Design a protein with these regions (language model features):
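Gly/Pro-rich, tryptophan- and cysteine-flecked surface segments typical
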Residues: 22-323
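Bacterial N-terminal signal peptides
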Residues: 9-19
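Bacterial N-terminal signal peptides that target proteins for export
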Residues: 1-10
Length: 323
């Protein structure tokens, strides 16, 4: 179950419900990772509307957030918030999802009048994903006749320490509604897929995985995946390998519901963690069960003079590359 709230310009309502929206289709973007913590951490979102078939466009776009607090468990469900804003074609709008910059209004001297803030998430450390779809002024989806009318990019920024990473929004090539499938997205990690990764010493660097499972009705439903570290050479028991070829075995998995940032330490036992703590190592990230997922590996260091202060790096673990 997902708690949903809607904000149409200045009207806010909060409700708990199951259900779906109108069956009419609309091109929909997925921003799988939105990280906010006003006023220190923000995600700047940019949305391009090139129009639909024959450059027909909707009058508005609806921005639907599914979120939970960073302190929530990986398995907890999400709440929801949404806002409806006018749009034009062609058009570009950029905004700060945390509300730190320009109060969440449009950025970079945008001459268009949107009439309010795009930032409808609560304060505090929040993890979320964002759906953007064509709609009417009430937020009902409309069909523009083209599955690639919208595109977008996002940049996650640590304003306090000065670091950033970014990604492109996802657009299912086969459909226009709030559902996403592996057949329409080339860069998910399918169930059963495994990707090799490395990590720096946890004594200095933090490694975590931002995981957003994808599936049907992502505007109302919490989709889930079970993730783990697969054993060396495909062993059924999990493992991690440190420098010097020492391999540590364990059986640990995490159930991710809606979205979560999973710490590397939560994917192994304490013996393995102690063994690789000062050296780092490598392993196999596995989507073991549930739904396909968008998975980004993030590695960062904060205020460490050895590495020039604060630095981070993130990339997508994708089924379209390998191993």
């Amino acid at each position: 179950m997902k708690a949903k709230s809607g904000l149409c310009m200045v009207l806010i309502s909060v409700a708990l419900f199951f259900g779906t929206f109108s069956p009419a289709k609309a091109d929909t973007l997925l921003f799988p990772i939105i990280v906010t913590n006003y006023p220190n951490v923000t995600t700047i979102v940019s949305v391009v509307n090139r129009g639909g078939s024959g450059y027909f466009t909707s009058s508005h776009l609806r921005y639907v957030y599914s979120y939970k607090y960073a302190s929530s468990s990986y398995s907890s469900g999400c709440f929801g918030a949404s806002v409806v804003m006018p749009t034009w074609a062609p058009d570009l709008v950029s905004f700060d999802a945390s509300g730190t910059l320009n109060g969440g209004g449009s950025l970079f001297n945008d001459s268009d009048i949107y009439g309010g803030s795009f930032a409808v998430l609560p304060s505090g450390a929040v993890r979320s994903y964002l759906l953007v779809t064509n709609s009417d002024s009430s937020g009902n989806r409309v069909d523009v006749g083209y599955t690639m009318a919208l595109s977008g990019e996002a940049i996650v920024m640590d304003i306090l320490y000065g670091a950033a990473w970014g990604y492109r929004a996802v657009n299912d090539s086969n459909r226009e509604d709030y559902s996403f499938s592996s057949s329409g997205i080339s860069n998910t990690l399918h169930v059963g897929d495994t990707r090799r990764f490395t990590f720096f010493p946890p004594s200095e660097w933090t490694t975590r995985f931002f995981v957003t499972p994808v599936g049907s009705n992502m505007n109302t439903a919490d989709v889930n995946s079970t993730i783990r570290l697969l054993g060396f050479q495909g062993s059924s028991s999990g493992s991690i390998t440190g420098r010097g070829s020492t391999t540590y075995n364990f059986n640990v998995s995490q159930y991710v519901n809606c979205t979560a940032a999973v710490n590397l330490s939560d994917l192994m036992d304490s013996t393995a963690w102690s063994g690789i703590y000062y050296s780092g190592g490598w392993g196999w990230f596995n989507n073991a069960a549930g739904s396909p997922a968008m998975v980004y590996k993030l590695e960062y260091v904060v205020n460490n003079a050895t590495y020039g202060g604060t630095n981070n790096n993130a990339f997508l673990l994708s089924s379209s590359d390998g191993p």
